[in-house]
Amino acid sequence: EFVDSYLPYLLARASFSISNEFHAQVEAAGFTVSEWRILASLSGVKQRTVGELADIVLAKQPTVTKMVLRMASEDLVMRTPCTQDKRQAWVSITPKGQKLVKPLLKKAALHEKNVLSSLGEPQSQALKSILQKLFKQSN
C-alpha cells in the first residue's frame, strides 16, 4: 500500500503513537501539550522570544502569546519586553515553572529511552540525526 511506505505518513504515525503515550503523563500533571512544550523549551535556557517558542511548540504566534500571558499569570513563566524590538517579548521560566516541569523532563527522557530501546544507541543517534537533517532541509 502507498501509505505504508510514504514518508510523511510514517513520520506522522510514529509521532502520533509515540507522543500520545507521553502526552497522557503531561495531562495527568495538569498541563496541556503546548504548555509542556513551552516549559520544556525554556528549561535550561535563559530566555526565548515568543516567536521562537511558536516555532518550537508548533503553534501560531498569537496563540503562543495568549498561552504565555496565561502561564505568566500562574507564575510559570515571566514575560519581559525586548529592549531592542518593542514588538518582541522575552519569555523565561520561573522557579515555580522549573520545579513543576522538572519531573516531566525526567519522565520524557525515560519515555524516549523506552521508545528507542529496541534500536540501540547507534541506530537511535542515526535516526535523530536523519530527522534533524530532514527538518533543516525543509525549513
Regions found by a protein language model. Give the residues of each.
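The alpha-helix within a helix-turn-helix
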Residues: 54
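Short capping segments at the starts of secondary-structure elements
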Residues: 45-49
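Residues within helix-turn-helix
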Residues: 50-51, 62, 69, 89
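Short alpha-helical "packing" element that flanks the helix-turn-helix/winged-helix DNA-binding module
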Residues: 38-39
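N-terminal leader segment of winged-helix/HTH proteins
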Residues: 1-29, 76
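Alpha-helical transmembrane segments and membrane-interface helix-loop junctions
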Residues: 50, 132, 136-139
